[in-house]
UniProtKB/Swiss-Prot annotation:
A motif (Involved in the recycling of CRTH2) lies at residues 330-333. Phosphorylated. This is Prostaglandin D2 receptor 2. The 330-DSEL-333 motif is involved in the recycling of PTGDR2 to the cell surface after agonist-induced internalization. This motif seems to be required for GRK2 and GPRK5/GRK5 to promote agonist-induced internalization. Thr-347 is a major site for PKC-induced internalization of the receptor. The gene is PTGDR2. Keywords: Cell membrane, Disulfide bond, G-protein coupled receptor, Glycoprotein, Membrane, Phosphoprotein, Receptor, Transducer, Transmembrane, Transmembrane helix. One of its GO terms (molecular function) is prostaglandin F receptor activity. Changing residue 332 to A: 45% increases internalization of PTGDR2. It comes from Homo sapiens. Glycans are attached at residues 4, 25. Its main location: membrane. Disulfide bonds join 104-182. Pfam families: 7tm_1 (PF00001).
Length: 395
């Protein structure tokens, strides 16, 4: 064991992990190679998808409260996707962290920042729609884009605050076989005289706090908000959910499915300090459910598209319309704006991946890529039925 490992106080479960040897089974190596390929593809998809969502929603659409929520969700997912290539590298070099202690802390902090930010933002979206339906007059007077951005900044600050313990206790630990772990070491700060008790109490506190704050409480807020909205809409005789409601439901379901198993294994890991029999199960399952949580950031942009009606029938035509409407000179938008705005299917409706919900128009000649690049984010915001549909969250 290296000097680095012997000088650091370690919890019993961490000491046992440091003594585990690397595997030499051929079938397991094939699984590792497949995992590297899968994570590499997921990181590429996540970066591209969330980058497109950020650009389209932030630069090519009229800013509303709803687009503000989507913008910050995509930013959180982009951060998580940006950290995924480094996790892929960790897998590729044989499950050994070769990027140093500081980057180990930063990489893990991004994972937990995304976890808290996603839960907080989904809660805010649900409360926003609840206020729109239950307190429409108040929402009309106070629900603004500036207020939504301020709420998001507060939620980001809370997410950063909750991430601090995971930054502090993350560390690199050398294994007997020469590999390096990037993992919790809850004895880094003030271990105390009874190390076993300190390990158990701190690990339980971390697992329970993130389960409550990043998962259970957000889901409770989302469920109660949905129940309040459903009751109010039933009194109004409106039963069919709007497009944005279906989008939120899909994103929340993906959040629960991707993050739920991680929290279960995190709680099992905390229990494994006192119950060594759980440790093999945790060591086998925790890497898998951690990857599943990462993939939530890749799934969300896809859900923005798949929640639209008649997606399979319109997918091919709609994607072509999306590209042709975005790759167009700004002067063409201005010159033909008056006639094109009168059309039911305007280019503004197809200015984002969410435009699969709209009816695509026929192509209008070759795309003007250079003009679009020169226009970029400086183009004037486009308005149209898509933005009106996104803004009408209670429809």
């Amino acid at each position: 064991m290296s000097a680095n490992a012997t000088l650091k106080p370690l919890c019993p479960i961490l000491e046992q992990m440091s003594r585990l040897q690397s595997h030499s089974n051929t079938s397991i190596r094939y699984i590792d190679h497949a995992a590297v390929l899968l994570h590499g593809l997921a990181s590429l998809l996540g970066l591209v998808e969330n980058g497109v969502i950020l650009f389209v929603v932030g630069c090519r659409m009229r800013q509303t409260v709803v687009t503000t929520w989507v913008l910050h969700l995509a930013l959180s997912d982009l951060l998580a996707s940006a950290s995924l290539p480094f996790f892929t590298y960790f897998l590729a070099v044989g499950h050994s962290w070769e990027l140093g202690t500081t980057f180990c802390k930063l990489h893990s902090s991004i994972f937990f920042l995304n976890m808290f930010a996603s839960g907080f933002l989904l809660s805010a979206i649900s409360l926003d729609r609840c206020l729109q339906v239950v307190r429409p007059v108040w929402a009309q007077n106070h629900r603004t884009v500036a207020a939504a951005h301020k709420v998001c900044l507060v939620l980001w600050a809370l997410a950063v605050l909750n991430t601090v313990p995971y930054f502090v206790f993350r560390d690199t630990i050398s294994r007997l076989d020469g590999r390096i772990m990037c993992y919790y070491n809850v004895l880094l700060l003030n271990p105390g005289p009874d190390r076993d008790a300190t390990c158990n109490s701190r690990q339980v506190a971390l697992a329970v706090s993130k389960f409550l704050l990043a998962f259970l409480v957000p889901l409770a807020i989302i469920a109660s908000s949905h129940a309040a909205v459903s009751l109010r809409l039933q009194h109004r005789g409106r039963r069919r959910p709007g497009r944005f409601v279906r989008l939120v439901a899909a994103v929340v379901a993906a959040f629960a499915l991707c993050w739920g198993p991680y929290h279960v294994f995190s709680l099992l890991e905390a229990r494994a300090h006192a119950n060594p029999g759980l440790r093999p199960l945790v060591w086998r399952g925790l890497p898998f459910v951690t990857s599943l949580a990462f993939f939530n950031s890749v799934a969300n942009p896809v859900l923005y598209v798949l929640t639209c009606p008649d997606m399979l029938r319109k997918l091919r035509r709609s994607l072509r319309t999306v590209l042709e409407s975005v790759l167009v000179d700004d002067s063409e938008l201005g010159g033909a704006g008056s006639s094109r705005r009168r059309r039911t299917s305007s280019t503004a409706r197809s200015a984002s991946p969410l435009a699969l919900c709209s009816r695509p128009e026929e192509p209008r000649g070759p795309a003007r890529l250079l003009g679009w690049l020169l226009g970029s984010c400086a183009a004037s915001p486009q308005t149209g039925p898509l933005n009106r549909a996104l803004s009408s969250t209670s429809s």
